[in-house]
Each structure stands twice: as C-alpha cells, then as structure tokens.
Amino acid sequence: RDFIAKEVTPVYHEWETEGHPPRKFYNRLGDLGILGIQAPEEYGGGGESSLKFNVVVTEETAAAGVTFGSYSVHSNLILPYIMQHATDEQKQRWIPGFASGDLMFAIAMTEPGTGSDLANISTTAKLSDDGSHYVVNGSKTFITGGALADRILLVCRTSPFDPENRRGGLSMLVV
C-alpha cells in the first residue's frame, strides 16, 4: 500500500496520458521482488509457487484505482509459458531480466478478423532456407505490453491449417 500511495498514485495520471508506466517503473517492481515473485530463485526470482502474492497486488491496485500496466500479463501469463516451454538455456537468458524488469515481454495472440480465436489465426512462421531463423508473416492487434517490450511471445502457425485439427501447427515463438 505504501509503495502504491507514494510511487504510483501521485503519477498515475501521467501514465494514463502516456498510455503506459515508464520503463523504470518495472525495474522498481523488480527491485521490490514483485515482478518475478513466481520465477525460480535460481534465475533471480522469488521462488513462490502460489498466486497469492499476485492476488494481493491485484487487490491493492484495484483498491487504489490504479494498475501496474502490463505487469499482470508479464507475470501471470507469459512467465508460466516460459517456465513450461523454454529450454534451460532460454530460461537462464530471459528470466533474470524478466524478474528484474530489465527485460520486458509482451504477448501477441489476437488477430484482425479472428480476435482471440487462436484456432483460426493466420500469422505464419516459416523456417528460413538455412534453418537459422523463422520468417514471420501476418498481423496482430492488441499486443499487450508491446509499447515497452524487448521480447514478444508470438502465437503463430508453423504448419498449414488443417480443418480436422484446427489447433494443430500452432506454435509460440519469442521474437
């Protein structure tokens, strides 16, 4: 509560005008241990497995009539994907910065014409001829956290659409 009262509420109107908090705000959340509370300690996080701390943040910000910008998507949506699907090398590369606020993530799922119906997305990613990278083609809207993102978790189709298995061929890439 003190943090919100002293460091968020007085400048919140500026964030609203700008459309997002300043980048240094996320570093401050990292300093306080809020941003990476569920990241494993071995990667610089708080090591908490419970969502209770995230619920406290949600309740306190709601009571003050403010938000922490893309904090919720960064911490509650993207981190679990990284923890479940990233390689150990990727976790070592991304999670320390994720927890400190030095590396901000956004998520790109929604597309014009399909909304968040992921089974019908048309954004594609094809492996380059030399196999070193993917070439992405398509459109996304409502990229939550995109204004300050260093990395974007992108949902795309890496195999052709199959009407018998509409979700087949969907992948998540970090770009």
PLM feature spans:
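Amphipathic, small/basic residue-rich leader segments at the start of a protein or domain
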Residues: 1-72, 89-93, 97-100, 104
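Short, solvent-exposed loop/turn elements at beta->coil junctions and helix N-caps
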Residues: 42-44, 109-114, 141-142
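N-terminal glycine-rich flavin-associated loop
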Residues: 69-89, 115, 127-130
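Flexible, glycine-rich active-site loops centered on histidine and acidic residues
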Residues: 79-85, 107-108, 119, 161-162
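A generic local secondary-structure boundary/capping motif
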Residues: 94-96, 113, 122-124, 140-144, ...
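A short, Trp-centered hydrophobic/proline-enriched beta-strand micro-motif
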Residues: 101-109, 155
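Cytochrome P450 C-terminal beta-domain/meander region
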Residues: 117-137
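A short core secondary-structure module
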Residues: 132-175
